[in-house]
Curated annotation (Swiss-Prot):
Gene3D superfamilies assigned: Phosphoglycerate kinase, N-terminal domain
Annotated localization: Cytoplasm; Mitochondrion
GO biological process, one term: glycolytic process
Pathway: Carbohydrate degradation; glycolysis; pyruvate from D-glyceraldehyde 3-phosphate: step 2/5
Alphabetic keyword roster: ATP-binding, Cytoplasm, Glycolysis, Kinase, Magnesium, Metal-binding, Mitochondrion, Nucleotide-binding, Transferase
Protein source organism: Hypocrea rufa (Trichoderma viride)
GO molecular function, one term: phosphoglycerate kinase activity
Protein name: Phosphoglycerate kinase
Subunit relationships: Monomer.
PANTHER family: PHOSPHOGLYCERATE KINASE
Length: 417
């Protein structure tokens, strides 16, 4: 799956056509149905405007919201999105009461002069995800013929298909892979994600550094394994580092996080790093806590003495930060996935903040810095530096699967140039 040769919305003639766009309007709503963070709606505006500015007959938007589990549930209606969307677009938006069916087709086919239509939640139909779960976790599979019918129903609403929902690209859902139109293009959000991940995974400027944090080694084995084929240097930080330190250096780690399952793969990963000539950087000092709490008492532990029993490492210390900065200074391409400590607690946010400051500085000096979604994107938002980095991915699960070397169904489904 090449990321850099996919058809983009700018390659497609939309004049006089119905443009069906899969957006990600899965926004947080409070109990009064007010949107608490409209970022995802704002993110889709350039793609929608491009279609309108280039003479689209109509723009039809489809999305999911929450997890209604294949049934209609007013709590998850997309209707509350309409006012915000109208405000950001500066034009009226028609809300369709469903996402498929004769009534919806009539609304869509009547629309012209660049009308914008928002369809109701795709996941009100079990055929979108292909299955649903009840409260006990029992799965019901969708009927194959009905899934086909649902996909035909979506296909009937457009002449050109555009996917701008990178965050759902790792899901083989009907709206991601089942729309059967001759041209299936990436929107601007999707295109930016693919371009930057191609810069890292297909043609990085070297030296290429990956910074991997987070809690469990076992969650990141595939990620580490895939990146060892691509990077020059790998910083392993966060809770995951303690498992490496204990296995490799027999360091006393006290009550710090230890991942027994992940520990078994550490020697194999380190062996691969040696074979591939990848330098692994681990922390050498730690900010410790007497309990997992924002108000915990703190201490400092080093490689020499280890972490005493009853204490746990929740962040890295100044010596480690120096090592990280050296690696960041040397690199030309930096990919960061997973914080360096428990940044949610102010006392243990120092390592993550210092790492962030160093990559922001690097970006200012021309380095390519990519933040791989999830917690690390939260860190960039917390300190308000998203616009000071080359790219902050919007897809937690999708970016992780891409970095693990997996094919993303929603990307594979797009037309190639």
């Amino acid at each position: 799956m090449s990321l850099s040769n996919k058809l983009s919305i700018t390659d497609v003639d939309v004049k006089g056509k119905r443009v069906l766009i899969r957006v990600d309007f899965n926004v947080p709503l409070d109990e009064n149905k007010n949107i608490t963070n409209p970022q995802r709606i704002a993110g889709a505006i350039p793609t929608i405007k491009h279609a309108l500015d280039n003479g689209a007959k109509a723009v039809i938007l489809m999305s999911h919201l929450g997890r209604p589990n294949g049934a209609v549930n007013a709590k998850y209606s997309l209707k509350p999105v309409v006012p915000k969307l109208e405000e950001l677009l500066g034009k009226p938006v028609t809300f369709a009461p469903d996402c498929v069916g004769p009534e919806v087709e009539a609304i869509v086919n009547k629309a012209d002069n660049g009308a914008v239509i928002l369809l109701e939640n795709l996941r009100f139909h079990i055929e979108e995800e292909g299955s649903s779960k009840d409260k006990e976790g029992n799965k019901t599979k969708a009927d194959k013929a009905k899934v086909e019918e649902f996909r035909k129903g979506l296909t009937a609403l457009g002449d050109v298909y555009v996917n701008d929902a990178f965050g759902t690209a790792h899901r083989a859902h009907s709206s991601m892979v089942g729309v059967d139109l001759p041209q299936k293009a990436a929107g601007f959000l999707m295109k930016k994600e693919l371009d930057y991940f191609a810069k890292a995974l297909e043609s990085p400027q070297r030296p290429f550094l990956a910074i991997l944090g987070g809690a469990k080694v076992s969650d990141k084995i595939q990620l580490i394994d895939n990146l060892l084929d691509k990077v020059n240097t790998l910083i392993i930080c966060g809770g995951m580092a303690f498992t490496f330190k204990k296995v490799l250096d027999n360091l006393a780690i006290g009550d710090s996080l230890f991942d027994k399952a992940g520990a078994e793969t550490v020697p194999k990963l380190v062996e691969k790093a040696k074979a591939k000539n990848v330098k692994i950087v681990l922390p050498t000092d730690f900010i410790t806590a007497d309990k997992f709490d924002k108000d915990a008492n703190t201490g400092l532990a080093t490689d020499k003495d280890g972490i005493p029993d009853g204490w746990m490492g929740l962040d890295c210390g100044d010596e480690s930060i120096k090592l990280y900065k050296e690696a960041i200074d040397e690199a030309k391409t930096i990919l960061w996935n997973g914080p360096a400590g428990v940044f949610e607690f102010e006392k243990f946010a120092g390592g993550t903040k210092a790492t962030l400051d160093a990559v922001v500085e690097g970006c200012k000096n021309g380095k390519i810095v990519i933040i791989g979604g999830g917690d690390t994107a939260t860190v960039a938002a917390k300190y308000g530096v998203e616009d000071k980095l080359s790219h902050v991915s919007t897809g937690g699960g999708a970016s992780l699967e891409l970095l693990e070397g997996k094919e993303l169904p929603g990307v594979t489904a797009l037309s190639s140039k």
